């Protein structure tokens, strides 16, 4: 017997317009209706379980109907419970209480808000143990540890370990230390005490918790105090002390320190008084830039490339002030001779042509502009001079051979070329002479006697001259022994020749590179002398000066 009565089938038939349904037909349709309802409900329960829910909804039934290729029932998508009312005049007849909706109200109703797009937003949970006060982070007052009594009361349920966020709490001593350093940097009233504070800042081992506070303090004061020259100098001294402290791990804070240092290097104006020596501040900042790149350039590979790009853009921009050009030149010069040779000397001639009108007192009437131009000119001269000085020191000129060597070489030696086809040593000597030393020299460019960089004398090889006639009392070997000895001597001679050939090729390549670099240095020296005249001569060492003159 079906749980669906035949009266239900008759009511459903009447609701769809079938009025002549026989009772026998309704009785036979009831079991089939029950089977179909059970089938749909089983599929709906599967949809509910796949959705990780325990409450069956109308959407689950719609999903089950779609799986059975049956058109879903419309008008029952509400998430709330259905309300049924009893039909008047019928004891067991119920219907859903549908609220009548006017089309005018539906049309005039405002549109709902568009749903937000799915996105991922990153924010800091904690910075150096301190939770930032941003809307994404819950305030610390809301998260509290549960009371011990409540934990003991919940013996049946699982215990939950609530961990509070780590709060970065500075000790009272560190707070006073930071405040004192900041006051000394701002007040500038006690220079001896400030120097002692800088020494402590560069050597104390317990100052790492203060590094984020110092970096923020330096960044804020540099951006707001460009007119205070003494404050900027004090801040740069703090940066140097932090860099010199071996107990501070400052790599994560370089991205905050570098903008402040570069600002003090290439800013248009530092200080608001004529007596402020901002040139010294720029030199100090250039030394800091060099220190940072040398110490942390291997850790941050893009650090020096980004810095040089910034400095080159400041140098080659004609709209920048001469003070900015000076800072860029000092910063590039502090990065080494290679940077100077590639970035400054390659642009030296066109830049000097643009700087020349500023150096002329007849064309430039502003004395301050003339002074700034001469400062830039001096910075370029110093950078180029130190570059050529270091270049010439790497490749010193070869000393001339001694007179005794030249005198002996007239009768006893020859200059041997490094050509692979000319590897044998020839010695012009009489057969009755005792064993002697043969001189081996290698030809450099233009027929000059080439030696190693250390300037040592030509290499000497002891090779005794063998007599053609053996002694009378010597024992003559057999024919087989003579053949084996001949083979061994030939193999040894072949190995010696191969090793000598490889050494000669290597020496030739080294000497060719040395002569090429030396020739480039000579050309560079001539070019700098054409641009600067006799002003470049004090940077040339005395030995190279004599060769150049």
UniProtKB/Swiss-Prot annotation:
Gene Ontology CC: one annotated term: SAGA complex
CDD domains: HFD_TAF6, TAF6C
Domain Histone-fold: 5-78
Disulphide bridges, residue numbers: none
Description of the deletion phenotype: Lethal when homozygote. Reduced pollen tube growth when heterozygote.
UniProt keywords, alphabetically: Activator, Nucleus, Phosphoprotein, Transcription, Transcription regulation
Subcellular location: Nucleus
Residue span of region Disordered: 399-501
UniProt note on tissues of expression: Expressed in roots, leaves, inflorescences and siliques.
Low complexity compositional bias, start-end: 467-482
GO molecular function: protein heterodimerization activity; RNA polymerase II general transcription initiation factor activity
Recorded superkingdom: Eukaryota
Residues recorded as bearing Phosphoserine in the entry: 434
Record's compositionally biased regions (Basic and acidic residues): 489-501
Subunit structure: Component of the TFIID complex. TFIID is composed of TATA binding protein (TBP) and a number of TBP-associated factors (TAFs) whose MWs range from 14-217 kDa.
Function per UniProt: TAFs are components of the transcription factor IID (TFIID) complex that is essential for mediating regulation of RNA polymerase transcription. Required for proper pollen function. May stabilize the interaction of TFIID with selected promoters. Not redundant with TAF6B.
Family, per entry: Belongs to the TAF6 family.
The protein's name in its UniProt record: Transcription initiation factor TFIID subunit 6
Annotated source species: Arabidopsis thaliana (Mouse-ear cress)
């Amino acid at each position: 017997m079906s749980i669906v009565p035949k009266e239900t089938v008759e009511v459903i038939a009447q609701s769809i317009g079938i009025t002549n349904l026989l009772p026998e037909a309704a009785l036979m349709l009831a079991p089939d209706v029950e089977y179909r309802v059970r089938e749909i409900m089983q599929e709906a329960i599967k949809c509910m379980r796949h959705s990780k829910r325990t409450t069956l909804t109308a959407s689950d039934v719609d999903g089950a109907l779609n799986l059975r290729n049956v058109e879903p029932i419309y008008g029952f998508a509400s998430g709330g419970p259905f309300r049924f009312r009893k039909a008047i005049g019928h004891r067991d007849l119920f219907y859903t209480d549908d609220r009548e909706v006017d089309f005018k109200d539906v049309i005039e109703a405002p549109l709902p808000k568009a749903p937000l797009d799915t996105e991922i937003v990153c924010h800091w949970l904690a910075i150096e143990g301190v939770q930032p006060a941003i809307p994404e982070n819950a305030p610390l007052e809301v998260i509290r540890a549960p009371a011990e009594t409540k934990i003991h009361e919940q013996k049946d349920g699982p215990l939950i370990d609530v961990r509070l966020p780590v709060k970065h709490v500075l000790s009272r001593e560190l707070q006073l230390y930071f405040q004192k350093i900041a006051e000394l940097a701002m007040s500038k009233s006690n220079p001896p005490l400030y120097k002692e504070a800088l020494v402590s800042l560069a050597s104390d081992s317990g100052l790492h918790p203060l590094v984020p506070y110092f970096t923020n303090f330096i960044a804020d004061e540099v951006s707001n105090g460009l007119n205070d020259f003494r404050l900027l100098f004090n801040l740069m001294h703090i940066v140097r002390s932090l860099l010199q402290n071996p107990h501070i791990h400052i790599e994560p804070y370089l991205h905050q320190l570098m903008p402040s240092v570069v600002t003090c290097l290439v800013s248009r104006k530092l200080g608001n008084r004529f007596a402020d020596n901002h040139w010294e501040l720029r030199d100090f900042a250039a030394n800091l830039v060099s220190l940072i790149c040398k110490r942390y350039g291997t850790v941050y590979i893009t650090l020096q490339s980004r810095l040089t790009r910034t400095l080159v853009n400041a140098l080659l921009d004609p709209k920048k002030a001469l003070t900015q050009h000076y800072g860029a030149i000092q910063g590039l010069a502090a990065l080494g001779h290679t940077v100077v040779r590639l970035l400054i000397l390659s642009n030296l001639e066109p830049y000097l042509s643009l700087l020349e009108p500023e150096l002329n007192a007849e064309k430039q009437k502003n004395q301050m502009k003339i002074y700034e131009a001469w400062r830039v000119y001096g910075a370029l001269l110093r950078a180029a001079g130190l570059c050529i000085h270091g270049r010439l020191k790497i490749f010193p000129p070869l000393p001339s051979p001694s007179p005794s060597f030249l005198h002996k070489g007239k009768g006893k030696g020859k200059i041997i070329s490094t050509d692979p086809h000319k590897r044998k040593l020839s010695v012009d000597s009489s057969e009755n002479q005792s064993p002697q030393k043969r001189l081996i020299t290698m030809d450099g460019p233009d027929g000059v006697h080439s030696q190693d960089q250390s300037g040592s004398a030509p290499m000497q090889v002891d090779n005794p001259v063998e007599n053609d006639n053996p002694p009378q009392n010597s024992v003559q070997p057999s024919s087989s022994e003579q053949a084996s000895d001949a083979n061994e001597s030939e193999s040894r001679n072949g190995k010696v020749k191969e090793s000598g050939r490889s050494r000669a090729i290597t020496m030739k390549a080294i000497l060719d590179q040395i002569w090429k670099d030396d020739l480039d240095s000579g050309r560079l020296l001539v070019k700098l002398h054409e641009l600067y005249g006799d002003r470049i001569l004090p940077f040339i060492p005395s030995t190279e000066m004599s060769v150049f003159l």
